[in-house]
A protein has these predicted regions:
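N-terminal Lys/Arg-rich, disordered targeting/topogenic segments
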Residues: 1-13
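Extracytoplasmic/luminal low-complexity segments enriched in Pro/Gly and acidic/polar residues
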Residues: 47, 246-250
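Charged/polar, low-hydrophobicity segments characteristic of intrinsically disordered regions
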Residues: 117, 240-247
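Short, flexible loop segments at boundaries between secondary-structure elements
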Residues: 217-243
Length: 250
């Protein structure tokens, strides 16, 4: 009899401990969800890292293709913008090797708008995708046949919008345009593509560094904080988590 009472007490104690653990886990999950919702809120997060670090600051993202922006900064751009940063996203190429510039540019703007970044904050330099432009060879857009900067219907390339003419496809002109767009907006923080195995990633990474070398020599008082980031693509059967784009960007 006494043994049965002891067993029942032991089972009751185990059950109480188990229920306490379950309640503790649920409490942690609720707190996590609450804080996550704050991060996703359109109002931003008061007194957060983003508020203290980026409020009233200028942030510029410089990438080759119309998906690299999400790969290197998709998690940080929305809270930066929501907490008062002036965000600009600069695409160096039209991503037009396999599809039209319009398709890639529309996708980019639509994706950024879903993250809260308006279309007017997006800049297209209008250079070709997948060429040997960076090593001094003649370059043409695969989809349009053009040999100068351009943008899809309803969009403008930066050089034409700023100077009234299109820029020929040369490595030097890309460096010039990156230098120009940085000096025009003078961002406090720059997130730029890093050097990897992709031809355009390498080319834009080097072009950015050449542009920054010029800027730092000319403008000794301008010293933005620069973060170089890799744009990593998934390989193999990763369809569950891969971005589904019309263009199926490489």
């Amino acid at each position: 009899m006494a043994e049965n009472v002891k067993r029942k007490k032991k089972k009751r104690a185990v059950l109480i401990v188990f229920m306490a653990l379950v309640l503790a886990v649920l409490a942690v999950v609720c707190v996590y969800e609450t804080e996550l919702n704050k991060l996703d809120s359109n109002d931003g997060v008061d007194n957060s890292f983003y508020d203290s670090q980026f409020k009233n600051k200028k942030v510029m993202v410089i990438v080759p293709h119309e998906d690299d922006d999400l790969l290197i900064s998709g998690q940080v751009l929305p809270p930066m913008y929501k907490n008062g940063a002036d965000v600009r996203v600069v695409f160096a190429t039209n991503g037009d090797k396999r599809v039209s510039a319009y398709t890639r540019q529309s996708e980019a703007c639509n994706a950024l708008e879903k993250l809260g970044i308006p279309r007017e904050k997006v800049i297209f330099l209008g250079y070709p995708d997948g060429t040997q432009l960076y090593v001094g060879k003649k370059a043409y857009s695969f989809s349009s046949g053009r040999d100068h900067t351009y943008a899809g219907k309803g969009f403008k390339d930066y050089h034409f919008d700023r100077f009234g003419t299109h820029a020929k496809y040369t490595a030097e002109n890309m460096v010039d345009d990156i230098e120009s767009v940085v000096l025009e907006y003078r961002p406090d923080y720059i997130l730029a593509i890093d050097f990897d195995t992709h031809t355009d990633h390498r080319g834009v990474s080097i072009s950015f560094e050449k542009a920054m070398e010029r800027i730092l020599k000319k403008e000794s008082g301008y010293t933005p904080k620069v973060l170089k980031c890799f744009a990593i693509h998934l390989r193999g059967n990763q369809s569950r988590i891969f971005m589904h784009l019309i263009s199926r960007a490489p």
